[in-house]
Amino acid sequence: MSAPISPEIDLDYNYEYEKNGPYTKFSDWVPYKLHKWEPKFLEDYYQLYGLKLHYGENELRRNIYFLKTGLKKRFRHPKNALCPVKDEDEYYKYRNLLFMHMNLQIMRSYMRIASQFDKRHLYFYNLDFAYDLNRSFEVADGFYKEAIPYWKEAQKYADRSSEIDSDLDLGTIETERYEIITGKLDFGTIIEDHLSRLEKKRKTVQEYLAQHPDANKPLLEQ
């Protein structure tokens, strides 16, 4: 006589089981397909952009990669745009606004990376690490300069998109365009200011290293 079937669910059998044990889920023997999404259009790569509250260089480089890749892709069909577009003029403005905004985001990402190698203030006791500071400031200088071409591209596309009078429902992107063409938002001046102050700090560090040659090597080797 067979044992009565228990109405209770065998949780150990269904959920807590050993991979190579006597009980194996039938689904483990069934091949399955991973449904993955592959970005194809410029908007797809733009939507991959994101920045957490606490971010580091890796997150910034990831965003730069997605945005740069997106700039080389074609746009979605107008009916799938990120905002309603009523005619060809609005679609022209839409494309230029996205080009402008993505170049701005790349520029900002480069500036954020540069700021991680820069120092807002250089105090006298920081010169104990003059060797490391000198190398760090050199990296910061490179990233600040890397941001400049993307600011110029953003200006170019802001001017082009301003040829169309109608406003698009793209959040603050229209505000960015207006502030760029009116000069209220001028990252060219901001970057120049960062580079100018960085050059003064680099000069201070290099003068210290010239006066203290023994300090021009890693701290552990001094």
Q: Model features per residue range: what roles?
A:
Residues 88, 95, 102, 129, ...:
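Short coil/turn linker motifs that delimit alpha-helical repeat modules in TPR/alpha-solenoid proteins
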